[in-house]
């Protein structure tokens, strides 16, 4: 990534946005993966 001039130099990577994205994305992918798997595991 190019250096962002608008943001301070010591901009942390692990921010609330990072926690929100991963905190929601990981369970969502697991949930969608479970639903997708159930579509193929029919009796």
Swiss-Prot record:
With its partner (PsbE) binds heme. PSII binds additional chlorophylls, carotenoids and specific lipids. It holds the Pfam family Cytochrom_B559. It is found in: Plastid, Chloroplast thylakoid membrane. The chain crosses the membrane at residues 18-34. Signal peptide: none annotated. It is a single-pass membrane protein. One of its GO terms (molecular function) is heme binding. Keywords: Chloroplast, Electron transport, Heme, Iron, Membrane, Metal-binding, Photosynthesis, Photosystem II, Plastid, Thylakoid, Transmembrane, Transmembrane helix, Transport. GO terms for cellular component: chloroplast thylakoid membrane; photosystem II reaction center. The keyword Acyltransferase does not apply. Its cofactor is heme b. GO terms for biological process: photosynthetic electron transport chain. Its main location: plastid. It comes from the Eukaryota. InterPro entries: PSII_cyt_b559_bsu, PSII_cyt_b559_CS, PSII_cyt_b559_N. Heme binds at residue 22. Heterodimer of an alpha subunit and a beta subunit. PSII is composed of 1 copy each of membrane proteins PsbA, PsbB, PsbC, PsbD, PsbE, PsbF, PsbH, PsbI, PsbJ, PsbK, PsbL, PsbM, PsbT, PsbX, PsbY, PsbZ, Psb30/Ycf12, at least 3 peripheral proteins of the oxygen-evolving complex and a large number of cofactors. It forms dimeric complexes. HAMAP family: PSII_PsbF (MF_00643). NCBIfam families: cyt_b559_beta. This b-type cytochrome is tightly associated with the reaction center of photosystem II (PSII). PSII is a light-driven water:plastoquinone oxidoreductase that uses light energy to abstract electrons from H(2)O, generating O(2) and a proton gradient subsequently used for ATP formation. It consists of a core antenna complex that captures photons, and an electron transfer chain that converts photonic excitation into a charge separation. Belongs to the PsbE/PsbF family. This is Cytochrome b559 subunit beta. It comes from Phaeodactylum tricornutum (strain CCAP 1055/1). The lineage of its organism: Eukaryota, Sar, Stramenopiles, Ochrophyta, Bacillariophyta.
